[in-house]
């Protein structure tokens, strides 16, 4: 594979003239560097990898030692081979003393520039430089290189035989590398291209490939070191080839020159042409570093010489990185490969030695060959890995240290791998030098056991005095062996830091023991699903917490620079005595590293606001950080644990017995966030843990005093109560007291369980519903009350019983009367019922209703009715709605409201929405506004229509009082229907200022249509801002120019008359063709022919004595002129073809002009209507739809009818397009035949008749097209009128009459349905608003595009007019040139000799042909302009019609949308039938939107088809242009032929002057013919015309570019229109919710 790639690279370079072979040496990715930029290490892994220096030209600027150089002994002459035997060689001198003539050896390796090439050159064969004399070129590289190729570029022919040698190393012998010879066998004894076989690849090959003498100069020879070597594809595995490509010096031995064989004649000139000359000696390769360096650098050696060496990596050294550094001998040195870097590895001496050697045997056994010597630190071994005797190595250290074992307490002086000595029984210590804890009496026999109890010993470590054996006990433990609790404590345990737990018993006993049936447990919060009722609190109060799902934590944040605490939920509160001496554990992290700790970071709050607190860092806990950390706090009274205040154990447990809050500080800096998770509080319970059923031995069982009972003496004995009511378990118990009405009481509250209809804590009063004195202590103390519903009563001083709590609506001593605001008669058995006044009465007022009938008497809030349920006349609203006061004044505007009666002061309105009954064209809730486009509301008859002109006004609105429309700039009139004074050009953009020049105008008023100002005499221009032709000084009254300009003016007038006459003549020929039968013309031709014959005979007579030269040259001139005339005829044909193309373009432009202009007017009106009337009407319809709920079937029918009209118009547009295409085809054919008529000859009359007939057909087609367009316009007007009627119907829609009482009954049933439907409607409205905005934007874009089309069309019209004029002038000019050339031919047939006169004729002829060339150039320019114009007009009639159709469809859809809005917005007052109708309308709307999208797709396809038609037209125009280009080439060729004729004439021999005089008359006639052509005078006119054309074309291109952008914008808008409604809901289901 490698060989194939090399051959391919070599072939490519050879064909490109760069025959260097491609690099074959394996390399790494040049961008593959390590993190430090070192390519010898992988960027990502930092692992070593093979690296090589850059591929360079190793010979560049190196000195080449040569054995022969020309010009060194003396200047020598040499001749350059030409390659042609008949051509003389160019000889030069080589002189080494002068730089410009020397060719030294340094030129072999210098920088060569293509246009300034340097070379080395040997002496020539003249100086004896030929076989067997050999010339050697020796290049010393300075160090070894891996060579890819050696390249030589010869200035002389390449040698016939030469050899390339190399030295592998500096001290090695020269060995042949490659032989080149055309005679391999004879010269070197080798076969040509002998095959190289595996196993013998380091063999030089001989080839004759580059030994040919051709090329004479510039020959290349490229030797690739690996070409043809079988193992080249496995280069890295072949040590033979690696050595083969290595070279430290290269020698080129030039043995024999290539010659043509002519040296045998010993001609010095020939011998000097044979020599060796080489311009470039290049050696491609890399500095050899064996894959261990990426660059070579200069280095000073021992002898001070600067040499090239590798900058070695991979722990290697040497000039070629060919050996390992000292101490890097763990494996043998190898060169790096693409697979393995083979870096040298350091010996593993455990950092205890810096000397090692490579041990081959060790390498074979272990794979590591580094053998360490001189180990330090009490070590030994191959890797210094062993300690010497009685020493050991500490973990993480290399050195070994002495064991130091105590001889009394140790069994041996050698320690183990951890440095521990082997101790005797009871002995401990690293060196076995002390007794174990719990042991004493250190001796040679070891130590004795003290017998300490582990659970009672300090820190659970049995420890005693080493002399006496006394044990060290925990705080609450006593005894010599620490085996019992102190009095008042229980539960001796190893898990208790203090040994025993204090007896609490609520202070009622000090004797207790361990209770059975309790197990250890945790109260936990893990926050795996929510925040588990944890709250937050700061100095202000409670704060909300957040659940952090990812962290499984609860979070709080600091917002006011005050600490925020996590507050534990209820499960952590209450009686937590079992948590004493247990741990509170949680995980905490914060958002900021800054922490400000406090002594109140952890707070436990007990009863009566008692607190226990500590710092977050107490008990060795860390500062909170952004990393989650676990915190553990022991709940214990000992000062060691840091709880404040410092109180005794019983008081501490007393706080735990009724915990009201546990607070954990969460934030420690401003705007900090704290995260709490995994909260656990150690406690005990009766339910064992399934995972770890551990006995809870710290739960007490107390021995109680009399009056107390319970496990903890927490309750009073039966018959006893708390000394203080609800005094709690700490309170003492005393006997009960119940005034003889009970024998028992509740222990905590002290309340008696009363009997005898008594109540109270001590039965001191009568129960509810009873009266009497309970303190008497008898059973009859309390009697029953005579009140309704067993209500309470009191005994009055007069002895009567009075009921104190009558039912609502009742009053009186026995509750037997109705209260104010109620009606009924309790005494007759009629209940008291609250008066129903709908909340429209004053609750503080008395007598709001009749107490018997319930009729409301004092209605407020502008209401009336039996129940105050309706608004008063002249008011509207809902009298029942909350809050009250909804009845508002109608406030109808009198001038705009209909009066149903003669009461002018009271104008009623609809009580549901407040809408007044408006006069025609009046709108507003209070009928106080004119509708959009109307005015004069004060008339009392309604509003009058503004009737603003759609073109001249900014919209359809006008002043509501005067009716004045808002006019566009420059427009005036109440209706904005005419241009203001001093303005013109009434259009959709307003009117433009006349801007008449004050000096040149009679006044400032201009023509209202064209804008032409009334100019003073001799002044012209639209603005009257310039003088007439040949006049100057407008400020001075346009004075006439001087006489010289008068003469020029006269000549210009003459020329114009001639051109006009010529145009008239041409037009006469076209209109009145006749057969060419001019007898006088024929006679004149015959007379001229006879004269020419006579002259010719005279010439022959003069030259009869042997002057055949003139005759021959004259005949040649004649033949050349005939050929020129034939080519001119071809030019005529090309011009005719170009004219056909130009006429076709002209017809297309005219057709587009007519169609676009008609469509522009129609669409401009439609667009203006959409922008003004359409948008305003749509807004009015939308407002109406907000008020009314009924749908208009008439609107749907009108919209459907409008769509049918649009389809009809589309069909008619298609017919118009077909007729237009037929008209174009007829016009094109007519134009072609007219062109043929100009050059047609005798058939003109017949063809003119046919043209007239086709012209009539064309006129008929045009009339039909116009008729259809007019019909289409009428249809569009009808559609617009129909849309206007539709909008009027929308305005006329009125709300139906609704019965308020019936509506009130229905509201409750459909209220929920209405709310859902309103939400859906609002969403639908929002979605449709976006569509409405899209419609408006589309309309605006269409308007802009049509305006651009209009401007472009105007420019195109003018351009086509100028094109037609240019074409006529070109035809005239070509005809004149043809006639002139024919006259020249007749004159040249008799020419014999020429003198001074002929020189003048020649100059005139040159000028004539220059004019012809200018005409041709103008023709080419016109064709280019035509081509550009046709390319710039991609929009044709159908395209514009399609856009109009799109605008019509969008208008219809806008009206339909307005209808749909009415059907949707306030449908909450409709029933389910209305809802279904709305759903149906929405589906219809979706179908219409889908149809709209399909229409847009159809229009897009039509536009693409039109674009293809335009492209075809451009292609035809391009063919016409190519024909014109060929005609231009023909004219240029003819010009060259004429110049040749003139040159031939110049070289003719002189003749007698007398003979020239005889021809002078003929020459004068020729001059007159040339002058009549006057082509030179037409050139400036054509040049100016061309400049004008260029300006117009540039403007046209700019307009077309803008138009195309607008088209793309419209297409993008169309593509973005939604194809369907995505918010489809089932309104019936929504209504049932």
Curated annotation (Swiss-Prot):
Observed phenotype of the null mutant: RNAi-mediated knockdown in L4 larval stage, causes ectopic membrane extensions from body wall muscles.
Superkingdom of origin: Eukaryota
Keyword Repeat: yes
Residue ranges of domain Laminin N-terminal in the record: 47-286
Example GO BP: positive regulation of locomotion
Positions annotated as glycosylated: 116, 136, 348, 522, 658, 740, 936, 1077, 1183, 1226, 1259, 1336, 1452, 1528
PROSITE patterns cross-referenced by the UniProt entry: EGF_1, EGF_2, EGF_LAM_1, EGF_LAM_2, LAMININ_IVA, LAMININ_NTER
A Pfam family the protein falls into: EGF_LMN_ATRN
Record's keyword terms, sorted: Disulfide bond, Glycoprotein, Laminin EGF-like domain, Repeat, Signal
Alphabetical list of PANTHER family matching this protein: LAMININ SUBUNIT GAMMA-1, NETRIN/LAMININ-RELATED
Function according to Swiss-Prot or TrEMBL: During the formation of neuromuscular junctions at the larval stage, negatively regulates membrane protrusion from body wall muscles, probably downstream of the integrin complex formed by pat-2 and pat-3.
Protein's name in the database: Laminin-like protein lam-2
Name of the gene: lam-2
């Amino acid at each position: 594979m490698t060989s194939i790639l090399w051959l391919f690279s070599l072939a490519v370079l050879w064909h490109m003239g760069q025959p260097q072979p491609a690099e074959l040496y394996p390399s790494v990715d040049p961008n593959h560097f390590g993190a430090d930029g070192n390519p010898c290490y992988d960027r990502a892994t930092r692992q070593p990898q093979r690296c090589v220096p850059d591929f360079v030209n190793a010979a560049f600027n190196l000195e080449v030692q040569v054995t022969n150089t020309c010009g060194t002994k003396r200047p020598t002459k040499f001749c350059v081979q030409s390659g042609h035997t008949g051509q003389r060689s160019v000889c030069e001198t080589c002189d080494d003393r002068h730089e410009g003539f020397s060719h030294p050896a340094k030129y072999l390796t210098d920088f060569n520039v293509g246009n300034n090439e340097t070379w080395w050159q040997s002496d020539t064969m003249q100086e004896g430089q030929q076989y067997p004399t050999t010339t050697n070129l020796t290049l010393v590289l300075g160090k070894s290189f891996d060579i890819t190729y050696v390249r030589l570029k010869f200035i002389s022919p390449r040698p016939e035989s030469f050899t390339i040698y190399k030295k592998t190393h500096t001290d090695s012998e020269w060995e042949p590398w490659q032989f080149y010879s055309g005679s391999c066998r004879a010269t070197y004894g080798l076969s040509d291209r002998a095959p190289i076989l595996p196993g013998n690849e380091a063999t030089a090959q001989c080839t004759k490939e580059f030994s040919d003498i051709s090329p004479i100069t510039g020959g290349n020879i490229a030797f690739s070191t690996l070409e043809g070597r079988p193992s080249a594809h496995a280069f890295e595995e072949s040590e033979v080839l690696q050595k083969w490509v290595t070279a430290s010096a290269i020698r080129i031995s030039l043995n024999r020159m290539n010659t043509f064989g002519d040296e045998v004649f010993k001609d010095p000139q020939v011998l000097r042409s044979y020599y060796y000359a080489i311009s470039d000696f290049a050696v491609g390769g890399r500095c050899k570093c064996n894959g261990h360096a990426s660059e070579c650098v200069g280095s000073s050696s021992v002898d001070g010489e600067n040499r090239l060496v590798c900058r070695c990596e991979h722990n290697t050294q040497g000039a070629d990185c060919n050996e390992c550094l000292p101490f890097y001998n763990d494996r043998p040195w190898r060169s790096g490969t693409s697979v393995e870097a083979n870096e040298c590895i350091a010996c593993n001496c455990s950092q205890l030695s810096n000397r090692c050697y490579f041990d081959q045997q060790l390498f074979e056994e272990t794979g590591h060959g580094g053998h360490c010597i001189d180990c330090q630190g009490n070590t030994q071994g191959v890797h210094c890995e062993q300690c010497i005797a009685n020493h050991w190595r500490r973990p993480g250290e290399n050195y070994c240290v002495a064991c130091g074992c105590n001889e009394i307490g140790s069994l041996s002086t050698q320690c183990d791998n951890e440095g521990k000595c082997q101790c005797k029984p009871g002995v401990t210590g690293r060196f076995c030098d002390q007794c174990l804890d719990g042991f004493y009496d250190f001796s040679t026999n070891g130590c004795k056991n003290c017998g300490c109890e582990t659970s009672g010993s300090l820190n659970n470590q049995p420890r005693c005095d080493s002399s006496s054996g006394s044990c060290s006990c925990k705080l609450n433990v006593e005894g010599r062996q620490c085996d019992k609790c102190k009095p008042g404590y229980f539960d001796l345990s190893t898990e208790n830091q203090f040994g025993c737990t204090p007896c609490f018993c609520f202070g009622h006993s000090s004797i207790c023991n361990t209770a059975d049936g309790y197990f250890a447990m945790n109260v936990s919060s893990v926050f795996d699903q929510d925040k588990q009722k944890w709250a937050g609190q700061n100095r202000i109060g409670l704060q909300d917490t957040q659940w952090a799902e990812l962290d499984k934590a609860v979070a709080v944040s600091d917002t006011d620079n005050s600490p925020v605490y996590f507050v534990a939920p209820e499960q952590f509160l209450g009686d937590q005595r079992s948590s004493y001496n247990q741990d509170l554990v949680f995980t905490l992290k914060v958002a900021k590293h800054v922490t400000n700790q406090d002594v109140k970071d952890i707070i436990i709050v007990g009863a009566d606001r008692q607190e226990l607190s500590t710092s977050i860092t107490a008990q060795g806990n860390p500062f909170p950080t952004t990393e989650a950390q676990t915190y553990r706090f022991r709940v214990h009274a000992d000062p060691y644990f840091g709880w404040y205040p410092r109180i005794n154990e019983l008081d501490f447990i007393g706080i735990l017995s009724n915990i009201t809050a546990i607070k954990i500080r969460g934030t420690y800096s401003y705007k900090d966030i704290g995260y709490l998770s995994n909260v656990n509080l150690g406690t005990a319970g009766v339910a064992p843990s399934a995972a770890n059923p551990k006995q809870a031995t710290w739960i007490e069982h107390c021995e109680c005093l009399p009056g107390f009972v319970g496990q903890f003496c927490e309750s009073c004995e039966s018959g006893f109560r708390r000394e203080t009511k609800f005094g709690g378990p700490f309170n003492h118990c005393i006997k009960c007291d119940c005034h003889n009405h009970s024998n028992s009481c509740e222990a905590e509250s002290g309340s008696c369980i009363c009997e005898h209809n008594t109540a109270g804590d001590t039965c001191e009063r009568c129960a509810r519903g009873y009266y009497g004195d309970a303190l008497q202590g008898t059973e009859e103390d309390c009697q029953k009350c005579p009140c309704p519903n067993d209500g309470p009563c009191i005994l009055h001083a007069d002895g009567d019983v009075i009921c104190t709590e009558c039912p609502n609506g009742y009053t009186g001593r026995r509750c037997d009367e109705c209260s104010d605001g109620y009606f009924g008669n309790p005494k007759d058995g009629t209940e008291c019922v609250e008066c129903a006044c709908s909340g429209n009465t004053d609750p503080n007022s008395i007598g709001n209703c009749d107490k018997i009938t319930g009729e409301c008497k004092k209605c407020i809030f502008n209401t009336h009715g039996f129940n105050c349920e309706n608004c008063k006349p002249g008011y509207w609203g809902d009298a029942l709605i909350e809050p009250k006061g909804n009845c508002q004044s109608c406030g109808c505007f009198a001038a705009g409201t209909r009066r149903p009666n003669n009461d002018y002061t009271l104008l009623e309105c609809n009580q549901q929405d407040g809408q007044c009954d408006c006069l025609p064209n009046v709108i507003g809730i209070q009928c106080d506004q004119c509708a959009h486009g109307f005015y004069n509301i004060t008339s009392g008859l309604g509003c009058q229509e503004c009737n603003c002109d759609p073109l001249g006004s900014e919209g359809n609105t006008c002043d509501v009082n005067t009716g004045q429309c808002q006019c566009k700039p420059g427009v005036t009139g109440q209706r904005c229907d005419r241009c203001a004074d001093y303005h013109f050009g009434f259009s959709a953009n307003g009117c433009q200022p006349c801007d008449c020049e004050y000096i040149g105008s009679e006044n400032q008023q201009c023509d209202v249509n064209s804008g032409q100002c009334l100019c003073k005499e001799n002044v012209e221009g639209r603005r009257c801002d310039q003088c007439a032709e040949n006049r100057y000084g407008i400020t001075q009254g346009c004075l006439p120019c001087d006489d010289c300009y008068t003469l020029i003016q006269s000549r210009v007038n003459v020329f114009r008359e001639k051109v006009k006459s010529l145009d008239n003549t041409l037009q006469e020929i076209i209109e009145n063709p006749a057969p060419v039968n001019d007898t006088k013309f024929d006679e004149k031709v015959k007379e001229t022919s006879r004269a020419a014959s006579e002259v010719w005979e005279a010439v022959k007579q003069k030259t009869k004595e042997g002057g055949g030269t003139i005759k021959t040259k004259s005949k040649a001139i004649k033949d050349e002129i005939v050929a020129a005339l034939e080519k001119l005829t071809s030019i005529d044909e090309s011009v005719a073809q170009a004219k056909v193309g130009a006429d076709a373009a002209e017809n297309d432009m005219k057709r587009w002009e007519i169609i676009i202009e008609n469509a522009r007017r129609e669409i401009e009106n439609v667009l203006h209507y959409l922008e003004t009337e359409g948008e305003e009407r749509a807004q009015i319809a939308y407002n109406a739809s907000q008020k009314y709920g009924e749908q208009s079937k008439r609107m749907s029918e009108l919209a459907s009818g409008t769509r049918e009209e649009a389809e009809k118009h589309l069909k008619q547009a298609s017919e118009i397009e077909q007729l237009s295409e037929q008209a174009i085809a007829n016009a094109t054919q007519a134009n072609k035949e007219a062109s043929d008529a100009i050059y047609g000859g005798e058939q003109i009359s017949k063809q003119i008749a046919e043209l007239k007939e086709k012209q009539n057909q064309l006129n008929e087609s045009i009339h039909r097209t116009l008729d259809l367009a007019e019909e289409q316009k009428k249809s569009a007007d009808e559609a617009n009128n129909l849309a206007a009627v539709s909008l009027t119907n929308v305005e006329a829609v009125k709300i139906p009459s609704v019965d308020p009482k019936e509506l009130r009954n229905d509201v409750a049933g459909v209220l929920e349905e209405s709310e859902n439907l309103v939400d859906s409607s609002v969403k639908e409205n929002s979605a449709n608003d976006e569509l409405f905005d899209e419609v408006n934007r589309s309309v605006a874009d269409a308007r802009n595009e049509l305006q651009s089309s209009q401007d472009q069309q105007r420019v195109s019209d003018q351009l086509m007019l100028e094109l037609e004029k240019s074409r006529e002038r070109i035809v005239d000019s070509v005809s004149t040139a043809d006639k002139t050339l024919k006259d020249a031919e007749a004159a040249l047939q008799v020419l014999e000799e020429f003198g001074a006169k002929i020189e003048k004729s020649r100059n005139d002829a040159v000028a004539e042909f220059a004019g012809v060339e200018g005409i041709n150039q103008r023709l080419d320019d016109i064709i280019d302009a035509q081509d550009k114009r046709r390319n710039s007009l991609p929009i044709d009639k159908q395209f514009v019609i399609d856009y109009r159709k799109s605008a019509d469809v969008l208008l219809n859809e806008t009206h339909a949308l307005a209808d749909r809005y009415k059907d949707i917005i306030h449908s909450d007052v409709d029933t389910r039938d209305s809802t279904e109708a709305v759903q149906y309308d929405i589906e219809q709307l979706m179908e219409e939107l889908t149809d709209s999208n399909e229409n847009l797709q159809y229009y897009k396809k039509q536009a693409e088809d039109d674009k293809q038609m335009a492209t075809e037209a451009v292609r035809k125009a391009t063919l016409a242009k190519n024909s014109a280009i060929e005609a231009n080439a023909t004219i240029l060729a003819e010009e060259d032929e004429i110049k040749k004729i003139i040159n031939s004439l110049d070289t003719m021999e002189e003749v007698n002057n007398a003979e020239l005089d005889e021809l002078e008359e003929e020459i004068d006639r020729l001059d007159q013919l040339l002058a009549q052509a006057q082509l030179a005078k037409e050139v400036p006119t054509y040049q100016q015309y061309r400049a004008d054309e260029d300006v117009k074309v540039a403007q046209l291109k700019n307009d077309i570019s803008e138009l195309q952008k607008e088209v793309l914008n419209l297409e993008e808008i169309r593509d973005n229109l939604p194809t369907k409604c995505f918010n489809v809901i089932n309104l019936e289901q929504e209504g049932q919710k």
